[in-house]
A protein has these predicted regions:
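Small-residue (G/A/S/T)-rich helix-start motifs and N-terminal tracts that mark the onset
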Residues: 1-119, 123-141, 145-166
Length: 166
């Protein structure tokens, strides 16, 4: 275990409140896995924003996570209020539908809070590269090599990829 031990009577609120915006039709496993990872990493509280179809899945698979429901039944279409969260992650399982792209753009323009962008959030950023200049300061992008190429430019060799990442 790589976690520092917690004091016996510490309150969960001392360890942050993470918001995960994740999951969609056919991809609710992404919401379960990312929320479990946030808890395992030491978050005191985890809220997962999912489409309505994800409510029962999340409550069954991870009852310790709180749920924030999107107004859509099957996709991320309206960003929740980010106030009250110490950390925000977005992307796994979202898909790249037009409404989801608009919701991500709204979230980016509405917050100054750093956000961790992963998976489909990165795919949307690669489709709307103008948003890269608007990311909140301190935000983190977590691309795998192909996502990185979509965000930047194709490279011929691994060495070129490393040089571009610098």
């Amino acid at each position: 275990d790589h976690m520092l031990p917690r004091r016996r009577f510490d309150h969960k609120g001392r360890y942050g409140h993470v918001l995960m915006i994740t999951g969609g039709y056919g991809k609710m496993g992404a919401a379960v896995l990312t929320s479990k990872a946030a808890l395992r990493a030491g978050s005191g509280l985890v809220t997962t924003h999912v489409p309505r179809l994800g409510y029962e899945i999340m409550q069954t698979a991870l009852p310790e996570a709180m749920i924030s429901l999107d107004i859509s039944d099957i996709i991320f279409s309206h960003p929740p209020d980010l106030d009250g969260f110490s950390h925000v992650g977005i992307g796994p399982g979202l898909g790249t539908k037009e409404n989801t792209q608009t919701a991500l753009e709204t979230l980016i323009k509405r917050t100054k809070k750093p956000v961790v962008f992963d998976a489909d959030a990165l795919n949307i950023l690669s489709l709307k590269k103008e948003l890269l200049d608007e990311l909140p300061e301190g935000s983190i992008l977590t691309p795998h090599p192909k996502e990185f190429e979509r965000l930047t430019e194709p490279v011929a060799t691994h060495f070129e990829r490393i040089e571009l990442q610098r």
